[in-house]
Design a protein with these regions (language model features):
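Hinge/capping helix and adjacent helix->loop/strand transition within the periplasmic-binding protein
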Residues: 31-38, 63-68, 87-98, 110-203, ...
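Extracytoplasmic "Venus flytrap"
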Residues: 40-57, 78-80, 161-167
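Bacterial N-terminal signal peptides that target proteins for export
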Residues: 2-14, 23
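Extracellular/periplasmic bilobal clamshell ligand-binding domains
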Residues: 313, 329-365
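Ligand-binding pocket segment of bilobal, Venus flytrap-like solute-binding proteins
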Residues: 77, 161-260
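C-terminal lobe and pocket-closing loops
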Residues: 218-310, 347, 355-365
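C-terminal segment of classical bacterial N-terminal signal peptides
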Residues: 17-28
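Mature extracytoplasmic/periplasmic domains
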Residues: 234-241, 254, 311, 315-340
Length: 365
């Protein structure tokens, strides 16, 4: 499904555009990490999409960073990823041996003024952005009744394993609300991989995974007829419209399913809020940062490493197989994604805050 030539052309064009828009680094390789170990920290458990993403990039960074250091992925899960982000905020390592990978689950508490947040994105130095997608799926007994809308599935009671309503799970939970589904989230899991395990054990009957985790761990379930995909969240086209995710062109986007489901509206403040957090959580979802104290020389070294990596002929194919069909941004493109990820309109923010209070009793104080 993911091997068609058209989408390979899209990937190549997207990657070419990203590289063309990046900041030129010139001879930035005066910095050298020979003999050193780079810790690539992600604030999640090792079973989810962020782990797959980090483990894809770690060996490539080792190959392309000056001095070919060892790059090791470290996991610091807790408090919906805010614990790891708070830890990173306090780090003073400035020599390039520490990088941090965030996700929408880290961006959302920041956007919503979560009191657990003691980190400031504007203090950090972004060196890569990765867009991604997500797929919602059902067990076979419900999946066989799904025909492009949820009209016949609204009377079902759903259980969903969630990291928390202010994490990246905000996007599916708000989508479920707009669709009119009765979904009871089981809060407290450490990563989306734990949500998938709940689904596999029959403890949850609706789930979603980001693209990398879906390709790795859910596609085998689909092939064994143990799971049925319902929709992807979609992707943004050049004009900012939601279209089908190029990694899953055969799946309807959430917008299509919403339009087909009675009572679900694709206009108004509810839709605007969902789209705003979808953009922050998926179109600009994953970002790699250096601590704020890193020098421009270190930033340039990482930018050059990612530019060289993306320019390799095999990168598009390998990244498609592991991460899906999404551009990787460096330089100016990474900065633009960083701005998208940490920006939300007051109206969308207030809608989400009101919804969190009314449906889950969550207030940001």
């Amino acid at each position: 499904m993911r091997k068609d030539n058209l989408r390979r052309t899209v990937v190549a064009a997207a990657l070419a555009g990203v590289v063309a828009g990046s900041v030129g680094t010139g001879a930035a390789a005066a910095q050298d990490l020979a003999g050193k170990t780079v810790e690539f920290v992600i604030p999640f458990a090792e079973s989810g999409g962020s782990a797959a993403w980090a483990n894809f990039f770690a060996p490539l960074l080792s190959k392309h960073l000056a001095g070919n250091p060892t790059v090791v992925v470290r996991y610091r899960p807790g408090a919906g990823s805010t614990e790891g982000a708070n830890w990173f905020q306090e780090q003073k390592t400035a020599d390039g041996t520490l990088i941090f990978g965030t996700s929408g689950s880290t961006q959302f508490p920041y956007l919503l003024d979560d009191p657990r947040v003691r980190y400031e994105y504007k203090d950090w130095k972004v060196v890569l952005s990765s867009g991604t997608g997500g797929v919602v799926y059902l067990p076979p007994d419900l999946g066989e009744r799904f025909d492009g809308d949820f009209d016949d599935l609204k009377d079902e009671n759903y259980l969903y394993g969630s990291q928390g309503a202010t994490t990246l799970d905000l996007v599916p939970l708000l989508a479920f609300k707009l669709l009119g589904l009765q979904v009871d989230p089981v809060f407290g899991i450490e990563g989306r991989g734990d949500g998938r395990l709940m689904f596999e054990r029959g403890e949850a009957n609706i789930d979603y995974q980001t693209t990398s985790a879906y390709l790795k761990s859910v596609v085998p379930l689909v092939e064994q007829k143990l799971a049925v995909p319902a929709f992807s969240y979609g992707a943004l086209d050049a004009d900012g419209n939601i279209v089908r995710d190029p990694t899953f062109p055969d799946l309807p986007s959430f917008k299509e399913v919403c339009e087909a489901t009675e009572g679900c509206e694709t206009s108004g403040v509810g839709w605007d809020a969902w789209k705003a957090f979808f953009v922050s959580g998926f179109a600009a979802q994953k970002l790699i940062y250096l601590p704020g104290g890193a020098s421009q020389e270190v930033v340039d070294m990482y930018t050059k490493a990612f530019e060289d990596m993306i320019a390799q002929p095999e990168f598009a194919k390998n990244s498609e197989e592991t991460l899906g069909v999404y551009p990787q941004g460096v330089g100016k493109a990474a900065m633009a994604a960083h701005e998208q990820a940490i920006t939300v309109t007051p109206e969308a923010k207030q809608y989400v805050l009101d919804w969190l209070k009314e449906d889950y009793g969550i207030t940001m104080q």
